[in-house]
Amino acid sequence: ALVLTMGLTSCDGLLDLTPKSEISQDDYFKTESDLQLFSNSFYNNLLDKSPFDDQSDLYVQQNLSDEMLGGNNRTVPASGGGWTWTDLRKMNTLLAYVNQCSDENAVVKYTALTRFFRAFFYFEKVKRFGDVPWYDVELGSADEALYKPRDSRELVMTKMIEDIDYAIDNLPAREEESSSPFRVNRWAALALKAQFCLYEGTYRKYHDLKLEGNDYTYYLDLAAKAAGEIINDGPYKLYSTGHPESDYLNLFAAEDANPDEYILAIKFDYSLAIHHNANGHTLVPTQGRPGLTRKMVNMYLMKDGSRFTDQPGWQEMSFLEETKDRDPRLAQSIRTPGYTRIGETTVLPPDLSVTVTGYQPIKFVQEPTASGGQVDRNDRNTNDLPVYRYAEVLLNYAEAKAELGTLTQEDLDISVNLLRDRAGMNDAHLNMAAANANPDRYLSAKETGYPNVSGSNKGVILEIRRERAVELNQEGFRFDDLVRWKAGACIDQDIYGMYFAGAGEYDLSGDGNPDVILYNKGTAKPEAGSGVLVYEIGKDILLTGSNSGYVYSHKNIVRNGFNEERDYLYP
């Protein structure tokens, strides 16, 4: 409450007001071009940061985020911290003046577009703060409404649904072909509705949120219907060339967004100096040393659909053993034995100097020749990034139906099992009856999973969560998922990497030659060939045991824990 009061005592702390005279309704908003130019800035909200560097229990960097450190490290600045409202003011400004345009079709179109972005804006605020003040009019510096308290979550969600339904009803189905993945259309609006209704429904269910108005089933039903409309009536499909060993990787590494799967994407362009940092982030030692965690790798099924964590001896398998015969998406998400970069023939091992866990990410990594051969430098990627893609819609549909208790095998066959088909796992479909008859112990355990999942659909809900983690890994969903599932305890779990049995030579590329040599303290440092990393156990590389175990790079980092009473929302 104190933080809110402080924010409300300053006009620019709340709505970041600018003089109203800067935009004159007599001079602007008269043509469709005016509306388009003014609304272009709204697109900057879609990706406020790179999705591939979000940290969680499944993906970490050398320096842990405040959320991962927990305790007093998770602080909110006196101003900012997400409590910024400038973009909302711009949206409400356009809505206040849009009728000055004489083109009625343009008025409807840009009203719909702006209401899409207002729903998007408030979704981000609700996720972060819970209750927030709702503003749908342009405010001046003297307006008393600046000082009103937060509105209820129920009111804000109701208004968001009104906005997104207007957008769905009035946005075009598809823009001109050249810009279709980069402009908001009615399918993107449906994708947003499915996303925020799934979030709200599961948040209310698992947090046992009792509010006046609609219960969690109302939102889950809306999510399922919105996703179902895209599935049944939309023009989208999963990208596939019939090469399951590379299609998933190539989808994200491609320069241009695939219009079949990407419903909405962000355009990057080397000639315009609009870049992101996927290559530098994963290939340069000073860019964070990201890595998937052992928990994430454990989630990938065997290629035949059986669970890796049901295999004998899975806890202490070598890297060569644990990556064999797995879901093909694993080898398209991290470097595994036999890995070569796109367009190259040299086999490369995971490079422990650039990954904190040993599981080196390759998703979104472009070929070395991209960006004029400069792509491996800091901030030089130009491959387009997804905001909404069809795969997420399929997962949202399956999860909403499962949580509602209305899921059928047919629903799985038009959603989750299409993802497995694309991955080449045609004979490893998710079977609802089998999953519910034998819920996965690993995903049920307090130490590694979600012990609060229960009911007759427990098994299939766990498997849908597995599929979501695998398919959407490194796309910025995980922390939000943990929040809505009330699974913050996952943040507290130990962060492990690949397993090493002790001192010795380790082949990580599968070519029969050592890539890493470990030796014990007090013994002579081994001689090594070019490119071979030599690490002293306990000094250069930390393991869970004194001389063997999982990579445990954060072993000496003090983590203060996730506070269940505080950390699901910011103040």
Where are these regions (language model features)?
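C-terminal motif of bacterial Sec signal peptides marking the signal peptidase cleavage site
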Residues: 8-10
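An aromatic- and glycine-enriched ligand-binding surface/loop that stacks and positions planar moieties
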Residues: 12-68, 157, 165-168, 183-190, ...
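Conserved, well-structured interaction surfaces
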Residues: 24, 32-40, 44-48, 64-130, ...
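Short coil/turn linking the two alpha-helices of tandem helical-hairpin repeats
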Residues: 126-133, 175, 196-208, 403-406
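Short coil/linker segments at helix-helix boundaries
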Residues: 131-153, 203-221
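A long, glycine-enriched binding/interface module in the latter
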Residues: 166, 182-185, 189, 409-570
